Design a protein with these regions (language model features):
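N-terminal Rossmann-like NAD(P)+-binding subdomain of aldehyde/semialdehyde dehydrogenases
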Residues: 1-113
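Rossmann-like NAD(P) dinucleotide-binding subdomain of oxidoreductase/dehydrogenase enzymes
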Residues: 105-175
Length: 175
């Protein structure tokens, strides 16, 4: 009985922590800073620099969690993630532009536009098989789109999850 009460208490505490993080993310998004292209590019640069600084740690964590060699860890996860971030950095302005789209004749003389706007707060849940790449690439995409993001790394890759947490905390300190 005592363990069930303790487990329930821990779940409630985790839930309140999740709610606190979500509210902070929503409040930050409401400030409107993420709409600016310069802000997005700066965040992507910080993310890239932090990944480069923790590159060896990521590869070691992937070896510990999944038995991947350092070469495989770099080629299949770190290198691809860095390439994605660099591509997003180069193209974030183009991705954010309003585009003209065709409209049907039934709506003549209307004009159609596709306006790229951030959603707000997004969630990234990483699987166990590519825990670094499939957490960081969607995070980078969310940042490039102007969203705030909550990242939930895989529980089945604890060493990699710890490195991801360190990178995210280094790049995006709370507050």
């Amino acid at each position: 009985m005592l363990t069930k009460k303790k487990e329930l208490y821990n779940r409630r505490r985790q839930r309140s922590e999740i709610d606190r993080i979500l509210q902070k993310q929503r409040a930050f998004f409401a400030e409107g800073k993420t709409y600016e292209i310069r802000f997005r590019k700066a965040a992507l640069k910080r993310l890239e620099a932090s990944i480069l600084a923790h590159e060896k740690e990521v590869c070691q964590a992937l070896t510990e969690d999944l038995g991947k060699s350092e070469t495989e860890g770099y080629m299949c996860e770190v290198g691809l993630t860095l390439a994605e971030i660099r591509g997003l950095y180069r193209n974030v302005k183009a991705y954010s532009k309003t585009k003209r789209v065709p409209v049907s004749m039934a709506n003549f003389p209307a004009k159609g536009y596709l306006v790229q706007e951030p959603y707000g707060v997004t969630l990234v849940m990483s699987p166990w098989n590519y825990p670094f790449m499939l957490a960081m690439e969607p995070l980078a995409g969310a940042i490039a789109a102007g969203n705030c993001c909550v990242v939930k790394p895989s529980a089945y890759a604890p060493a990699t999850s710890a490195v991801i947490a360190a990178i995210v905390k280094e790049c995006f300190p709370e507050g």
